[in-house]
Design a protein with these regions (language model features):
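A short alpha-helix capping/helix-coil boundary motif
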Residues: 28-30, 67, 99
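Short beta-strand elements in bilobed, periplasmic/extracellular small-molecule ligand-binding domains
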Residues: 58-66
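Aromatic-enriched hydrophobic runs in primary sequence
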Residues: 27, 59-60, 91
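Glycine-centered loop/turn motif at secondary-structure junctions
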Residues: 57-58, 95
Length: 100
């Protein structure tokens, strides 16, 4: 079984006029691939639990992105499109998607 495991988290404050850019989704922007796996493995998050479960099952994993921003204004359209496309691009051949 091949699982796509990803994290996208943002609390939107619609009253804020300032858009949330891609760079806000992590210390230096989102984590990708092996970095996303390393950051989330063992973390007290749903993505961390999904990774633990996948490893216990012996499942193959794809971790295209881990993106978490602090509460802020509406997500910039280009940032949203990039995050979504990163997940979509990793999906072919996967049996299931676990999204945190």
């Amino acid at each position: 079984m091949k699982l796509l495991i990803a994290k996208v988290s943002h609390e939107t404050n619609t009253f804020s006029p300032v858009r949330t850019p891609l760079e806000a989704f992590g210390l230096n922007g989102p984590d990708y691939g092996a970095d996303a796996l390393a950051v989330q493995r063992g973390a007290p998050t749903a993505m961390g639990a999904f990774i633990d479960l996948a490893e216990a099952m012996g499942a193959e994993m794809v971790t295209p992105i881990s993106a978490m921003a602090n509460p802020s204004g509406t997500v910039d359209g280009a940032a949203y499109a990039h995050i979504c496309q990163t997940i979509v691009d990793a999906a072919p051949g996967c049996d299931a998607l676990l999204l945190d």
